[in-house]
UniProtKB/Swiss-Prot annotation:
<comment type="subunit">
    <text>Part of the 30S ribosomal subunit.</text>
</comment>
<dbReference type="GO" id="GO:0005840">
    <property type="term" value="C:ribosome"/>
</dbReference>
<dbReference type="InterPro" id="IPR001047">
    <property type="entry name" value="Ribosomal_eS8"/>
</dbReference>
<dbReference type="Pfam" id="PF01201">
    <property type="entry name" value="Ribosomal_S8e"/>
</dbReference>
<protein>
    <recommendedName>
        <fullName>Small ribosomal subunit protein eS8</fullName>
    </recommendedName>
</protein>
<comment type="similarity">
    <text>Belongs to the eukaryotic ribosomal protein eS8 family.</text>
</comment>
<dbReference type="InterPro" id="IPR022309">
    <property type="entry name" value="Ribosomal_Se8/biogenesis_NSA2"/>
</dbReference>
<dbReference type="GO" id="GO:0003735">
    <property type="term" value="F:structural constituent of ribosome"/>
</dbReference>
<dbReference type="GO" id="GO:0006412">
    <property type="term" value="P:translation"/>
</dbReference>
<dbReference type="GO" id="GO:1990904">
    <property type="term" value="C:ribonucleoprotein complex"/>
</dbReference>
<keyword id="KW-0689">Ribosomal protein</keyword>
<keyword id="KW-0687">Ribonucleoprotein</keyword>
<dbReference type="InterPro" id="IPR018283">
    <property type="entry name" value="Ribosomal_eS8_CS"/>
</dbReference>
<dbReference type="InterPro" id="IPR020919">
    <property type="entry name" value="Ribosomal_protein_eS8_arc"/>
</dbReference>
Length: 130
């Protein structure tokens, strides 16, 4: 069944709202990309969006652009340590904005939206030695 992002057909009281028009194609939504950590190679999907534009969805990510002090490096993603969007996402290795990922050079926080941008950008976390 399609995901519809139009107005709800229920009133706050629970009563029904009768639409004065049909549902429009522009009101359709899509399933989330749920970008995972790749095993061997990255996988992208190009989708058509409203107005004929294109959006690149990152389905499987192998590398991340990690920035530290203005310098960026392309490093391999090892796994997802924590994900504040959903605690099950860390277990399933799903990357979203705000997720903490383990890379070759240390832990980093994802600053991009991989399902919308098609790339994983992250900022390196400072390791605290206590």
């Amino acid at each position: 069944m399609a995901i519809w992002q139009g107005r709800s057909l229920k009133k706050p009281s629970g009563g029904r709202i009768v639409l004065a028009r049909k549902k429009r194609k522009r009101e359709l939504g899509r399933e989330p990309a749920n970008t995972r950590v790749a095993e061997e190679r990255e996988k992208r999907k190009i989708i058509r969006t409203y107005g004929g534009n294109r959006k690149v969805r990152l389905v499987e990510a192998l590398y991340a652009n990690v920035f530290e002090g203005g310098k960026g490096r392309k490093v391999k993603i090892l796994n997802v340590v924590e994900n504040p969007a959903n605690r099950q996402y860390a277990r399933r290795n799903i990357i979203t904005k705000g997720a903490i990922i383990e890379t070759e050079i240390g832990k980093a926080v994802v600053t991009s939206r991989p399902g919308q941008d098609g790339v994983v950008n992250a900022v390196l976390l400072k390791e605290e030695n206590a």
